[in-house]
A protein has these predicted regions:
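Mature extracytoplasmic enzyme cores
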Residues: 1-152, 160
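Small-side-chain structural scaffolding
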Residues: 11, 174-176, 199
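Short, well-ordered alpha-helical packing segments
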Residues: 77, 81, 119, 159, ...
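Secondary-structure transition/capping motifs at alpha-helix termini
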Residues: 87-96, 171-180, 195, 209-211
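Aromatic-lined carbohydrate-recognition surfaces of secreted/lumenal glycan-active proteins
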Residues: 98, 103-106, 154-191
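Substrate-binding cleft/loops of secretory-pathway carbohydrate-active enzymes
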Residues: 107-116, 180-212
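Core alpha/beta catalytic barrel or barrel-like domain that forms the active/cofactor pocket
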Residues: 133-151, 157, 182-191, 199-203
């Protein structure tokens, strides 16, 4: 399977024109005759981080999940359901009671700043197309007010996806099974207060640490 999937291919002219060329890419080849002028092409790909779970508990080894994807989180929680219901070979012999709490030990997924379908989510939530502003979004150096607004909207969208698709779905799932959620939200790409408010027991670690030597 390919390491990354093309999400958008955008062309930007020196006169301010923007074209979406995504549907002109077939089998990895672009079929497009550029109009007169100077054009800059920006391709946006979505791929896997290939990160493994850190300090995994027995049975929890493997790749990290996509916290922004409702489907990925649902699949992850479904594995726990099958385990507690005794539907795995190594758990055959009857169901096991769910614990009183499920604990999320902080957000430690580095470089995970995108998700499949994020362009569509951005449009639905922010009301404009992020792909049409990729030059500003990716610009280095001093940021203009417009660029700051675009980046703020992008971060808000990621935060909403994390809260809705991971934190809220996880908490609602736990409640259906008579359990509560404990969460360390620090490190998450979202509004920490909102994330803490979405769980039953907010926790933190190392907040405001001082070196007492």
């Amino acid at each position: 399977k390919p390491y990354a999937k093309l999400e958008r291919l955008m062309a930007f002219s020196d006169t301010g024109k923007c074209l979406d060329l995504t549907d002109k890419v077939k089998d990895g080849m672009l079929c497009w005759k550029a109009p007169k002028g100077s054009w800059r092409l920006i391709a946006a790909f979505c791929g896997k981080t290939l990160q493994k779970v850190k300090r995994a508990a027995p049975g929890g080894e493997g790749y990290v999940m996509n916290h922004f994807s409702a489907r990925a989180v649902k699949n992850y929680l479904g594995r726990f359901e099958r385990a507690f219901d005794g539907k795995f070979k190594d758990t055959a012999g009857g169901a096991t009671a769910y614990p009183h709490n499920f604990f999320n030990d902080s957000y430690e997924v580095y470089g995970a700043d995108w998700s499949e379908g994020l362009f569509d989510e951005f449009l639905a939530r922010r009301g404009y197309k992020l792909e049409e502003h990729l030059p500003e979004f990716l610009a280095a150096g001093e940021r203009s007010d417009k660029t700051r607004c675009i980046i703020s909207d992008y971060r808000e969208t990621l935060g909403e996806l994390l809260q809705e698709n991971f934190t809220r779905q996880w908490t609602e799932w736990a409640h259906r099974h008579g359990a509560k959620t404990r969460n360390q939200a620090h490190g998450s790409p979202g509004n920490l207060i909102d994330l803490y408010a979405t769980v039953d027991i907010p926790e933190c670690e190392g907040f405001g640490l001082s070196d007492f030597g």
